[in-house]
A protein has these predicted regions:
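Short, hydrophobic secondary-structure boundary micro-motifs
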Residues: 80-85, 106, 149, 174, ...
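Long hydrophobic alpha-helical segments typical of transmembrane helices together
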Residues: 175-219
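Generic structural "secondary-structure junction" signal
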Residues: 45, 51, 84-85, 153, ...
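GST-like fold's C-terminal all-alpha helical module
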Residues: 100-186
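Non-transmembrane alpha-helical segments in soluble domains
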Residues: 70, 74, 94-97, 137, ...
Length: 219
């Protein structure tokens, strides 16, 4: 029996899980369940937070959110691991994952705020989320050497964050003044796992038709 993943094709956190599934060669073991977390109350039966991604295991157990789901998937294969087992390398990978997830949180919050009626928007919160994103991108530019390590979960989180930021706020031009980060992202974005889960690729297909790119070698 396959695992079942509550998902939408637009969620960057779902994309993060799918990238890990591709990297681990597990896409064939996952059935994607199209789910709108805002309207589908059946999701709450599996996850009281009613958030995606939510993974239902073959034995009926349920896992959420993306860091938990990603680490679980990474534990199911015997290839190079995205989650180091221990030591400083593990904490470095988890720190980068937290930063990437934080950029995604700020980007999503900012987008939701600007979709409100102009009279209901909070300029203070919009500014705060913009600052969180720009400061994080500056930090990554200053610490770009951390991205040259073997591919870990932090790289996946940062890659998904940059991809989503570029789609939702293209006018921000995050690349200006961050050439090292831009070079890294352009290279990372060519990975089969990133290509198969790009915004353009997923927007053309219903979730149940997402194809597996198979496992790929780590850098």
């Amino acid at each position: 029996m396959k695992m079942r993943l509550h998902a939408t094709t637009t969620s960057p956190f779902v994309r993060k899980v799918l990238v890990v599934a591709h990297e681990s060669g597990l896409m064939r073991d996952i059935e994607l369940v199209p789910t709108n977390p805002h309207t589908d109350e059946s999701l709450r039966l599996d996850n009281p937070l009613c958030k995606i991604p939510t993974l239902i295991l073959a034995n009926g157990e349920v896992l959420f959110d993306s860091p938990v789901v990603c680490e679980y998937l990474d534990s199911l294969h015997h290839g190079a691991q995205l989650f180091p087992k221990d030591g400083l390398e593990r904490w470095s990978a988890l720190r980068l994952q937290a930063l990437g997830d934080g950029i995604l949180d700020a980007t999503l919050s900012r987008r939701m705020e600007i979709m409100r009626a102009p009279t209901e928007q909070s300029p203070e919160w919009i500014e705060r989320w913009m600052l969180a994103s720009s400061a994080s991108l500056d930090w990554l530019e200053q610490h770009a050497h951390l991205l040259e390590e073997p591919i870990r979960i932090g790289h996946v989180a940062i890659g998904c964050a940059l991809g989503y930021f570029g789609v939702r706020f293209p006018d921000d031009d995050w690349r200006t003044g961050r050439s090292s980060l831009a070079v890294w992202f352009d290279r990372f974005d060519t990975r089969p796992s990133m290509r198969a889960t790009s915004h353009e690729a997923l927007s053309k297909l219903p979730p149940t038709q997402i194809k597996s790119g198979g496992p790929v070698a780590r850098q």
